[in-house]
Regions:
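Conserved active-site beta-strand-loop modules that form the wall/rim of enzyme catalytic pockets
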Residues: 148
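Short, conserved beta-strand element in jelly-roll/cupin
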Residues: 152-156
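Short acidic/polar, Gly/Pro-enriched loop/turn segments located at secondary-structure boundaries
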Residues: 1-145, 158-177
Length: 178
């Protein structure tokens, strides 16, 4: 189950002050502030211009941990782009399932989701879940905060909190969950 894997992985903490890319729970790669991590549809991973070799398996997840004072960019295999803020952890599969795309976030990201009506995109946090309908938006959901927020830039998203309350956002709207 994705939620169980994501929760387990986000309990791991960063070592030192470097941004860490954890590939398949095995290899830890330190990357420079502002570097872009790119996943291709063929399964290759690159940090900046450097390609990283690893075995791409659908049932394995990678994690990126960005410590305070740092930021990075992540391009997922489907072409969706994430700007990951300081103090953030993101857990995601190397390859998305054919009918569903989902990631887990503890912290803050700005995401521009590649539209694919056959495979909805979900951003899960400890406080809520966002169903993405081909859009760009910001999620701020740090574990220690009393509230979490979603700000929609374009497109549409459906929010569902832990009590199963739902809300649809339109562009330029903000939802705050406490």
């Amino acid at each position: 189950d994705f939620s169980v894997v994501a929760t387990k992985m986000t309990n791991e903490s960063a070592v030192g002050d470097d941004i860490q890319l954890i590939v398949s729970q095995e290899e830890v790669i330190s990357i420079k502030k502002g570097s872009t991590v790119t996943y291709s549809q063929s399964g290759t991973v690159s940090v900046g211009e450097e390609e990283i070799s690893h075995t791409a398996t659908e049932d394995l997840y990678d994690q990126i941990i960005v410590p305070k004072g740092k930021f990075t960019r992540l391009i997922l295999a489907d072409g969706s782009s994430l700007h990951i803020n300081a103090g953030t952890k993101v857990v995601y599969p190397k390859h998305f399932a054919k009918n569903k795309r989902e990631i887990f976030v503890d912290g803050e990201i700005f995401i521009d989701v590649k539209r694919d009506e056959s495979a909805p995109f979900f951003v899960k946090t400890a406080q809520f879940e966002v169903e993405v309908l081909g859009t760009a938006f910001n999620v701020s959901a740090y574990k220690g905060d009393d509230y979490a927020e979603v700000v929609l830039l374009r497109g549409a998203v459906n929010l569902k909190d832990n009590k199963k309350n739902t809300l649809k956002l339109s562009p330029n709207q903000l939802a705050s969950i406490s």
